[in-house]
Regions:
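Hydrophobic small-molecule pocket/channel-lining residues, especially in calycin-type beta-barrels
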Residues: 1-318
C-alpha cells in the first residue's frame, strides 16, 4: 500500500494430508467485511513425479469473489526460488494475454519473501505489483478444523448472502461409510468447517486409508458451486467438480479440464464443456441436519451410459 510500515496481516500456514500439501490462510487485521482485503486461502504441493509445484487459491474480497478455489498456478523450483505461473484472466485482453508469476524466495526456517508480477509481452518484462515479507511468529499444527472452523474465520460476514449458504449443512463432524456397488462398506469420517468469513467451507475426510482435503465455495462470477478435492496419494493432483446448485438435489460434475496443466493457457475455458466432458458425477440425494447421502456414478467417455460407482453416507457425530 506504499505506506511507511506497509500493510500487516496474519498468515496461518500448516501442512495437511500427511505433509503432502501446505495450506495458507491469510487474515487481515481489519475485519470489517465492507473494507477488509487480503483474506484468502491457498494450497501448495509438489508433484513428486514431475517436479512441478501446483498452487490453488481462493482470495475473496468485497470487490472480487476469488473464483472459488479455482485460481491456480504451476511452476518449479529454480536456484532456491519457487516460481509459479498462470494465465491472468482479469488482466488479459483478446489482443494480448497476460501471464502472472508468483515467486517464493529467501526461504529459511524463520522467514521467506513472496512477490507477485505480471507480464503482457510474453515475459520480456515483468511488473511487480506486490512484495510481502513473512516472519514466523509461532509453530502451527492442524489436522482438522480447530473448534469447528478454520483459522481466520470469525463472524462469516464477507459472504453472508443466501447463495453462499447452500452447502452449510455439511459443516460439522461426521462418521462416513462408502458403500461400493458390490455392497462392501469402507468406514471413514469427515470434519468440515467454515473459512474465509463465509466464502468457503473446508473439510478433511478419510475413507479407508486415504485422506482428502475438500473445499466448497459458490462463485458469483461463474454462477457455479465448485468442489475442490486433493488426496494424500503421491503423484495425484487436485480435481474439480462443479454444480449449478448446492445442497439437496445438487449434481457435481467432474471438470478435468479445469485443473491447471499449462503456465500460459486459460484453464477456465474448459468449464463450458464440463457437462459433456464429465467422467464422474456426485448427486446429493439426502441433505438433512443429521444425515447426508451422495450417490456416485462414472462413465468411460462422453457417449457412454453412467454406471454406479458407490454411495457415501454421512451421519452426524456432533
Amino acid at each position: 500500500d506504499h505506506v511507511e510500515t506497509g500493510t500487516q496481516m496474519r498468515q496461518h500456514v500448516f501442512t495437511i494430508l500427511g505433509g503432502k500439501a501446505l495450506v495458507e490462510l491469510a487474515e487481515p487485521f481489519d475485519l470489517d467485511p465492507a473494507e477488509a482485503a487480503g483474506r484468502g486461502f491457498s494450497i501448495r504441493y509438489l508433484d513428486g513425479e514431475t517436479g512441478d509445484w501446483i498452487m490453488a487459491q481462493h482470495w475473496p474480497n468485497p470487490n472480487f469473489d476469488g473464483i472459488a478455489f479455482m485460481d491456480q498456478l504451476t511452476g518449479a523450483s529454480h536456484l532456491g526460488r519457487v516460481q509459479v505461473y498462470s494465465h491472468d484472466v482479469p488482466q488479459s485482453t483478446p489482443e494480448q494475454a497476460a501471464i502472472r508469476r508468483y515467486t517464493f524466495s529467501d526461504i529459511t526456517e524463520e522467514r521467506f519473501r513472496w512477490d507477485g508480477a505480471v507480464t503482457r509481452d510474453d515475459g520480456d518484462s515483468w511488473a511487480i505489483w506486490q512484495v510481502v515479507d513473512f516472519t514466523r511468529q509461532a509453530d502451527e499444527a492442524m489436522s482438522t478444523p480447530r473448534g469447528g472452523r478454520w483459522p481466520g474465520h470469525h463472524d462469516g460476514l464477507l459472504c453472508a448472502d443466501e447463495a453462499h449458504r447452500a452447502m452449510d449443512g455439511v459443516i460439522g463432524r461426521w462418521n462416513s461409510q462408502f458403500v461400493l456397488p458390490d455392497g462392501t462398506i469402507i468406514d471413514g469420517r469427515l470434519d468440515a468447517g467454515p473459512m474465509l468469513e463465509g466464502c468457503g467451507i473446508g473439510a478433511i475426510s478419510r475413507i479407508g486409508s486415504t485422506e482428502y482435503f475438500l473445499g466448497w465455495a459458490w462463485s458469483p462470477m461463474l454462477q457455479l458451486w465448485v468442489q475442490m478435492t486433493l488426496s494424500d496419494r503421491p503423484g495425484e493432483r487436485h480435481t474439480y467438480a462443479i454444480s449449478g446448485t448446492g445442497g439437496e438435489g445438487a449434481v457435481f460434475l467432474s471438470a478435468p479440464s479445469a485443473t491447471i496443466s499449462s503456465q500460459t493457457e486459460n484453464y477456465y475455458s474448459g468449464l463450458g464443456t464440463a457437462a459433456t466432458d464429465a467422467r464422474s458425477r456426485q448427486m446429493i440425494e439426502v441433505f438433512q441436519s443429521d444425515r447426508i447421502e451422495i450417490r456416485m456414478q462414472a462413465r468411460q467417455d462422453a457417449e457412454a451410459d453412467w454406471s454406479e460407482a458407490g454411495r457415501l453416507v454421512l451421519t452426524r457425530e456432533d
